[in-house]
């Protein structure tokens, strides 16, 4: 015999021979039913009537006295997590006590979110922000229990969150760079991407059976079918990073030069890094011949805004048409650039142009999306130069071009990179090979690099708004030597605008132009 009470209900009972399952909620109705059956049997004695009642009472779910009775747990519906397309917007992170996710509106996937220069990627705590539905049709929520079971107060929902930091070219960020990522332009293309993926999403109730939902690992999209539950945000760290001379922007292949190990001539190729003279790498300063860069210069980026060696910021020298870019963390176009000095201009990309002699200049970069984040870069010029366009046959004619407080400069003011910048060159003849070292305060050509206002043979223009031409520039110094007839002469000392080489007119003949550059201390 089978007796079923409301089989569609969460609680129901079945009555079978030797197998009795009874609902906690329907004990009273079963008891009345059994008593009615017994009363119909008029031959039953009081004892048998009482025995039957006692036998029924012993079938309480809390009582296991009957060996033929099995009590099963009460079954209901599983809680449900709704894997809609919008749930990816509830993946986010907490940083410095603030929660960020697209559903809250303080970050979106299609724009770059900036944080200030103190940001450490290790401090981002990846989180999900799923909430329960108040009703089954509440689209603002993400999970529901149709039987109204209470959710587990300690862990109503669980999931596995994986994340990865990448740059704009999908290069994975090395965790070693997490604490200083803003100015890692040589390693990563900005902005960064934070990719968050949720798997094994489950809902948990406190008492229900079952008390856990099926795991969710995908969402069904209308256009692409099943897709992983992944959200990607664009992140950038605001900061001032580099002061980048325009010569580096226009011609990155000629950042520094070196001298061949046998000193027979300068290396034809620039930017070399192998072992050089005196076992010093060719990209490091070498006082014997110059060349390489100081610790204040970063390959392909220019000078650090916070120098390691120098106590001053780049530049300390200037000329009309000198240009450099203030390189920022993130994307240049995300900032507004202004200056406090009318003698210089700065464009929308942070490209600064020096127009007139001036002493101290401050450039301010303000984040467009948050004007509370802004940075000042201040530099002070010590020396202002005026290169002359024409060439001159001798040092005296060149000197005559400098009037007032201006004058021809010393070799160390143009290139102070090697022993040839200051040593006595009396008796020297021919070509002595040496070049500039890129460093702040190492002279005009050491700061600004190869200087040229128009193309010369295959050489690319580096400062188009300046008056620098290819050639040799007279200094205010000379040395005693002899000519081809072994006659004693006094000869001017020159410096090349191409690579800062210090030399003499007789070493290069009359075919290469000799020019004048006048300087004034500010």
Regions found by a protein language model. Name each.
Residues 305-338, 345-414:
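Extracellular adhesion/carbohydrate-recognition regions
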Residues 385-477:
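Conserved hydrophobic ligand-interaction patch in extracellular adhesion modules
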Residues 66, 256-257, 261, 268-288, ...:
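Short, structured beta-strand segments at or near domain termini in extracellular proteins/domains
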Residues 1-42, 285-287:
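N-terminal secretory signal peptides that target proteins for export/translocation
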Residues 59-68:
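Sec/Tat signal peptide C-region and signal peptidase I cleavage site
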Residues 72-160, 168:
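Long, solvent-exposed N-terminal ectodomains/accessory regions
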Residues 444-522:
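Extracellular C-type lectin-like domains
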